[in-house]
């Protein structure tokens, strides 16, 4: 590459300035003489530190070029394997693809939870701004706001029909909403602190809630009465989730444990203690995942002939763990997130696990091989929640950046 006379002159002056300002006096005077430079004060100012500046900007550009090259390669891969042009993927293997289809703004504070409606093409989001918002995920349209809570809404849950929505809040209440008329039909009081999690039981006639008051409570939908209290956690209970048939509930806590409870007797069936920090989130494995789990863990089907149940947990220790509840053992630990794990869920097809974290990413795990197969830089800030639609190819995420993003899967 040939430099023009002007460029050569600039380079020589920059080198001369570098030699002089770093104390290479002898080299400076020889170089100045050989390059026939007449340095004066005006020029000196202009070329002060120029060589270092050019040097660092070249390094910065190189780094940027490498980043862009790797993004380009990723995009090429997407194009050949994921697009409609390349090989057809089985829907069981569809995963979210960047960029997001929609980035929706409306909440005025961090988004705390995002969930899909079980029937209609809507999703619901909860936020620290004390509101619940309803959106159409296919068009990206905002539909309405449900107001009633007086403090941060922490969690939301539909019943299986999608006619009822439960919500819980730092205002210490749980509310039940008629999702057809969008009205609050019941408010439940009983917890003594922030209610951090809520879930409607599979049969639809009870609700479970978890609170910073260290308890889990079960409520009757019909009357709003508290019918059971589960005690055992030693700190704030972060999340509670019933299993598919509603005979068990799992909970996780600041006490670094995951507990599984028998609903009928309130007995704690398992206390799982391998995390080294607050356990933020849990999720039951769907039956579609059982064969992959057996392959991954080499666990033979038990004497009873039925594997599982299995549970996932995500923690501030940055790991995700998979547990076999029948034996109370950790089957695997997935390591890769660089910050607190805030959401974890099985892919409906059962082959993958999705997680989101305070490292601002969503990760897709091929857990059979215990590896992270894809990382999406999802938001500008911590990713607090994610949901994978059970039948449509969509994932939704919520973040402290106050946005909700809809991702298409293919």
Swiss-Prot record:
PANTHER family on file: COATOMER (PTHR19876), COATOMER SUBUNIT BETA (PTHR19876:SF2)
Lineage: superkingdom: Eukaryota
Domain remark text: Dimerization mediated by the LisH domain may be required to activate dynein.
HAMAP family: lis1 (MF_03141)
Full protein name: Lissencephaly-1 homolog
Annotated InterPro entries: Coatomer_complex_subunit, Dynein_regulator_LIS1, G-protein_beta_WD-40_rep, LIS1_N, LisH, PAC1-like_LisH-like_dom, WD40/YVTN_repeat-like_dom_sf, WD40_repeat_CS
Family to which the UniProt record says this protein belongs: Belongs to the WD repeat LIS1/nudF family.
Sequence ranges of the WD repeats: 106-147, 148-187, 190-229, 232-271, 274-333, 336-377, 379-410
GO molecular function annotations of the record: dynein complex binding; protein heterodimerization activity
One GO CC annotation: cytoplasm
GO term, biological process aspect, one: nervous system development
Coiled coil recorded as keyword: yes
Alphabetized Pfam families for the sequence: LisH_PAC1 (PF24951), WD40 (PF00400)
Domain LisH: 7-39
Cystines in this chain: none
Coiled-coil annotated residue ranges, if any: 56-82
Biological role: Regulatory subunit (beta subunit) of the cytosolic type I platelet-activating factor (PAF) acetylhydrolase (PAF-AH (I)), an enzyme that catalyzes the hydrolyze of the acetyl group at the sn-2 position of PAF and its analogs and participates in the PAF inactivation. Positively regulates the activity of the minus-end directed microtubule motor protein dynein. May enhance dynein-mediated microtubule sliding by targeting dynein to the microtubule plus end.
UniProtKB keywords: Cell cycle, Cell division, Coiled coil, Cytoplasm, Cytoskeleton, Developmental protein, Differentiation, Microtubule, Mitosis, Neurogenesis, Repeat, Transport, WD repeat
Native species: Xenopus tropicalis
């Amino acid at each position: 590459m040939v430099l023009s006379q002007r460029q050569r002159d600039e380079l020589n002056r920059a080198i001369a300035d570098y030699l002089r300002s770093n104390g290479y006096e002898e080299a400076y005077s020889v170089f100045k003489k050989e390059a026939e430079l007449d340095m004066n004060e005006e020029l000196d100012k202009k070329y002060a530190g120029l060589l270092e500046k050019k040097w660092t900007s070249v390094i910065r550009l190189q780094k940027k070029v490498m980043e862009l090259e790797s993004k380009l390669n990723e995009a090429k891969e997407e194009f050949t394997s994921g697009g409609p042009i390349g090989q057809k993927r089985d829907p069981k293997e569809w995963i979210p693809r960047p960029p997001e289809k929609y980035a929706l703004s409306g909440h005025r504070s961090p988004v705390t939870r995002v969930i899909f409606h079980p029937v209609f093409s809507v999703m619901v989001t909860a936020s620290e701004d004390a509101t619940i918002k309803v959106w159409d995920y296919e068009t990206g349209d905002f539909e309405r706001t449900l107001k009633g809570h007086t403090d941060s809404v922490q969690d939301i849950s539909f019943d299986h029909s999608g006619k009822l929505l439960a919500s819980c809040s730092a205002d210490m209440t749980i509310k039940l909403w008629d999702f057809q008329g969008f009205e609050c039909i019941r408010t439940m009081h009983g917890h003594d602190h922030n209610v951090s999690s809520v879930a409607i039981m599979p049969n639809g006639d009870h609700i479970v809630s978890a609170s910073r008051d260290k308890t889990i409570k079960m409520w009757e939908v019909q009357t709003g009465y508290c019918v059971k209290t589960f005690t055992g956690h030693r700190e704030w209970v972060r999340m509670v989730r019933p299993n598919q048939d509603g005979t068990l509930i799992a909970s996780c806590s600041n006490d670094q444990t995951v507990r599984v409870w028998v609903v009928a007797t309130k007995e704690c069936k398992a206390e799982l203690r391998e995390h080294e920090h607050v356990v933020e989130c849990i999720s039951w494995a769907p039956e579609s995942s059982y064969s992959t789990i057996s392959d991954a863990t080499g666990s033979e089907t038990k004497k009873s002939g039925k594997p599982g149940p299995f549970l996932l947990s995500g923690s501030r220790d940055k790991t995700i763990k998979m547990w076999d509840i029948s034996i109370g053992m950790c089957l695997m630990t997935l390591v890769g997130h660089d910050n607190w794990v805030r959401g974890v869920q099985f892919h409906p097809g059962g082959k993958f696990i999705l997680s989101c974290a305070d490292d601002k990413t969503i990760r897709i795990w091929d857990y059979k091989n215990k590896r992270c197969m894809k990382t999406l830089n999802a938001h500008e800030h911590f990713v607090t929640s994610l949901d994978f639609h059970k039948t449509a190819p969509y994932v939704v995420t919520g973040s402290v950046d106050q946005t909700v993003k809809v991702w298409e899967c293919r």
